[in-house]
Design a protein with these regions (language model features):
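Ligand/substrate-recognition segments at binding pockets and active sites
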Residues: 14, 68, 238, 262, ...
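Surface-exposed binding/hinge segments that line
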Residues: 165-210, 235
Length: 565
């Protein structure tokens, strides 16, 4: 199991490299980059170790079928729409990203793009593609596919399109030749390279053939894959499971012990997840269960539970455009009523109390921000200043949405309810399936007053925990459910994105965090550790920092005759 110190250095490196200035952009995507702890780019790998003798557990069922147990449904299989971990899991295995995250250095590195350069003082990015990549129908992946895929994202305006919408017009995406594509931004864009880890490429010919009423093939991609990824979609039962088979001619090749099939089953009850893993019927879990679930799985002879620091925030975004949480004093009362110590130590079981939106392990975190502590006297003081009385708050009603079927989520809701009850405030805890939660997040009117959200880094940059949460152009996603910004916050975040100097950019992100916290748009609860359950007969798992990249099934193999039992 990796040590915390090694992993922490690598996390710092992840963000430092992802925010690399355009002057460092270059040939093979493996440039040495500035880090906040002064370490070089040569730390030991983030590979999680198997049992001491390397033998894994005894043979069981499963063979070369990889079974991932997901605690939430897959809302979409279109890579242009993916924004959460199950959607990212599908994209990561069915498609290829332009740039990936190196598993050893956690830096952005070559993938479909084998090299890149900048022109016009960092305003234009030019990518040279590999010449040995084919889609699952056997046709070669070319610059035309890359250009179409990014144009498609900009036109659909979904998923992570906000990374580029304000900076890149489709008319400025240029195919120079079969292997070269250029993106001419309307200004220098500091985190550009980091953003392309969330840009997945589709087969332009197949998608265009299956467009319906200008949907850019969206309906088609809900039941079919059109990628160059390691696996090809066989079946998707929305809300239940996806199944995929290995693409024989995948450009990265296969080993004898690679997984022939990949499937993910949605199981929301922790007791069922634990039983499935204990009986050797599952290969891997997600990271969103309660601490007791992982402790119990770690005691199983056939399951191991790695634990490493991660770039993640757990918080309750407070809907700032909906009464009564549109009142800053109500928001402050809610925040001071919450029991942070119990949340971190008893429910999550590790990590630390968050200090603002950017995880404390991330370069660019504002170290001047102080973690919150429960203070019921202060909570009552702010409540007395509010435009709403306790009676009016209760008459309007406060809704707290939690993800259905997850014990940790339920306990967090109850802990929040207990604190608010001390103030005389009633709280409705509303368990929802993830797909319904994300649907409701598309408008301020339908978004709950507060919602349990785990927000993992979406790219190697603090932009992920600032711009994506608090810039108006990002509103309408589960990530931005506070519906909060100001002109000053928006301008500061825009200045951060314009800067091509790493240190200047990080300073702007720190400035933005201070402005954000003043408005109390969230109850910032924790920066949890990363834990998952892994069957002992799975090898090759690596922590890679960015959400869902850890679940690249092609990078893992089976030891033994099947799953350990």
């Amino acid at each position: 199991m990796p040590t915390g110190n090694i992993e922490r250095r690598k996390l710092l490196k992840l963000i430092g490299s992802g925010a690399t200035s355009v002057a460092l952009a270059g040939c093979q995507g493996t440039q040495q980059t500035e880090t906040t702890d002064g370490s070089s780019g040569s730390d030991s790998t983030a590979t999680e170790q198997t049992s001491d003798d390397g033998s894994g557990g005894s043979g069981g069922s499963g063979g070369n079928d990889f079974h991932f147990i997901a605690g939430q449904v897959f809302g979409t299989l279109d890579p242009a729409e993916q924004v959460d971990y199950t959607q990212g899991l599908a994209a990561q295995n069915l498609y290829d990203e332009l740039i990936t995250v190196d598993a050893e250095t956690l830096q952005p590195t070559a993938h479909i793009a084998e090299s890149w350069d900048t022109e016009d003082e960092g305003q234009t990015w030019v990518f040279t593609l590999r010449d040995d990549v084919t889609f699952s129908d056997g046709t070669p992946l070319t610059a035309d596919d890359v250009a179409y895929s990014l144009t498609r994202m900009l036109e659909l305006q979904r998923g992570y399109s906000s990374f580029w919408l304000d900076y890149l017009d489709p008319s400025n995406i240029t195919v120079r030749d079969e292997r070269t594509v250029a993106f001419e931004f309307n200004q220098a864009y500091g985190p550009a390279l980091a953003t392309f880890v969330q840009f997945y490429i589709v087969n332009s010919a197949v998608v265009q053939e299956n467009e319906q009423d200008g949907d850019y093939g969206n309906a088609y991609l809900q039941n079919n894959s059109a990628g160059s990824g390691a696996y090809v979609l066989d079946n998707w039962e929305q809300g239940n499971s996806i199944e995929a088979s290995a693409y024989e001619d995948y450009w990265k090749g296969w080993s004898e012990d690679s997984f022939d099939t990949f499937r993910s089953t949605v199981i929301t009850e922790e007791s069922t997840i634990k039983t499935t893993m204990q009986q050797g019927e599952g290969d891997m879990t997600d990271q969103y269960m309660g601490t007791q679930a992982y402790a119990e799985m770690d005691s199983y002879s056939n399951v191991r539970v790695p634990e490493v620091p991660q770039l993640q925030l757990f918080h309750f975004p407070l809907n700032c455009q909906k009464a009564p949480t549109d009142d800053i004093n109500v928001r402050k009362a809610i925040a001071y009523a919450f029991d942070y110590d119990s949340a971190v130590n008893d429910i999550i079981g590790g990590g630390g109390v968050a200090a603002g939106p950017v995880p404390r392990e991330m370069a660019g975190h504002n170290g001047d921000l102080v973690p919150m502590e429960q203070d019921l006297d202060k909570a009552k003081e702010f409540l007395d200043k509010a435009d709403y009385s306790v009676e009016e708050i209760n008459e309007i009603g406060l809704e707290h949405v939690v993800v259905a079927g997850t014990e940790l989520q339920r306990q967090m809701g109850l802990l929040n309810q207990a604190g608010l009850n001390e103030l005389g405030i009633d709280l409705e805890i509303n368990p929802l399936q993830w797909a319904r939660l994300t649907d409701r997040a598309t408008s301020a009117e339908s978004t709950a007053h507060m919602t349990n959200i785990f927000h993992t880094a979406k790219m190697p940059s603090p932009d992920s925990h600032t711009y994506l949460m608090y810039h108006p152009s990002s509103f309408g996603s589960y990530i931005s459910q506070s519906w909060y910004s100001t002109d000053e916050i928006a301008a500061t975040l825009e200045e951060a994105r314009k800067s091509t100097d790493l240190q200047s950019r990080l300073e702007k992100y720190e400035e933005a965090q201070a402005l954000i916290v003043e408005g109390m748009p969230s109850v910032y609860i924790a920066n949890p550790p990363y834990r998952i359950g892994i069957n002992e007969n799975v090898e090759g798992w690596q922590y890679r920092g960015v959400m869902s990249f850890d679940w690249d099934v092609h990078s893992m193999t089976r030891s033994g005759e099947g799953r350990a039992k």
